Curated annotation (Swiss-Prot):
Pathway linked to the protein: Cofactor biosynthesis; iron-sulfur cluster biosynthesis
Keyword Iron: yes
Biological process according to GO: [2Fe-2S] cluster assembly
GO molecular function annotation: 2 iron, 2 sulfur cluster binding; cysteine desulfurase activity; metal ion binding; pyridoxal phosphate binding
This enzyme's EC code(s): 2.8.1.7
Keyword presence, Metal-binding: yes
Residues the record lists as N6-(pyridoxal phosphate)lysine modifications: K204
Protein name: Cysteine desulfurase IscS
Matches recorded under NCBIfam families: IscS, PRK02948.1, PRK14012.1
Gene symbol of the encoding locus: iscS
GO cellular component, one term: L-cysteine desulfurase complex
Keywords from the UniProt entry: 2Fe-2S, Cytoplasm, Iron, Iron-sulfur, Metal-binding, Pyridoxal phosphate, Transferase
Amino acid sequence: MKIPIYMDYHATTPVDRRVLEAMLPYFAEDFGNAASKSHAFGWRAEEAVEAAREEVARLVGASAKEIVWTSGATESDNLAVKGAAQFYQSKGKHLVTCKTEHKAVLDSMHALERQGFEVTFLDVEKDGRLDPARLRAALREDTILVSIMHANNETGVVHPIEEIGRITRAAGVLFHCDAVQSAGKLPFDVEDANVDLASLSAHKMYGPKGVGALYVRRKPRVRLIAQMDGGGHERGFRSGTLNVPGIVGFGKAAELARLEGAAEAERVLALRERLRKGLDAGLDLLTVNGSLAHRVPGNLNVSFAYVEGEALMMAIKDVAVSSGSACTSASLEPSYVLRAMGISEDLAHSSIRFGLGRFTTEEEVDHVVRLVVEKVRKLREMSPLYEMVKEGVDLSQIEWANPH
């Protein structure tokens, strides 16, 4: 077993060796620009790019012409949300999203608010899922876009996107879905979900960093305002020379996910349950954050009451985990996702996100269980609050001298 152990698969995944092998020729031998139409170097690059486009499209049930290459999911989210809102603003300026979305969507929405759009930020249920009835009630005559993710990046909780898609389609409202954490791990089909726009990322499915895609529906055609000016690449949606090796890697990663994803999900789910049951057997006052029934297979987001998440992360420093999203973990604020689920600030501060994936082993899971149980017990020994609770004191009845 190699130390350190990687259990942060929602932040990024290692590039699969088969993906790397597919990419290598496009760095030095077949190095052409896919937009160079006048010679064989360009033709070979373009051929590879189009083959990858087919693979990514097949993974999500789309046609290749509906896949637009980007630099990653953040760009895909920005292009979808801002591009659609700006194009369709003559029909209305009301947008709907959810309080637990990724920052790339939330901050795009805030940027649009500054441009005069009105945004409704929906609450989620205690289990982290969006109740479709809340969405239905929020739609108005001037609503033009709904943006709801498929699976949450912190809790792994899966929203009922098929039902959401039926509601938006019936209302004639565009539906953008951030499918970054689900594509390749769960079945995700743009037709089944009535999705009009979907964000995808290579590095969340064992592909390279710095390459993403945006699915843009053609029937009925969805229009966007480009967010970057330039040579009009990608049918005018996204200018810029294509990252050919990265795109080839994305294509291979998508192919592997399509062929092996179901079997892999089963294996990873068994490992996740082994981790959960092991922690549960060794510790009390342990809370799983978010629905277990509706969740990506490799996610376990747990709060260890009376233990600071940051302190536990330092105590298990040879295990790579996170306390929240990698995009916001520089902040010491408790996770906004957990707070939106109604989880107390103290419990949110004590949360750890374990992300398991393709290269996680049983041996690693068992080692992590032993280590976490040992360190949580040790940290709780230093907690007077934990001691009081064990002695039967109801902390909610205590009047503190200096309430924090």
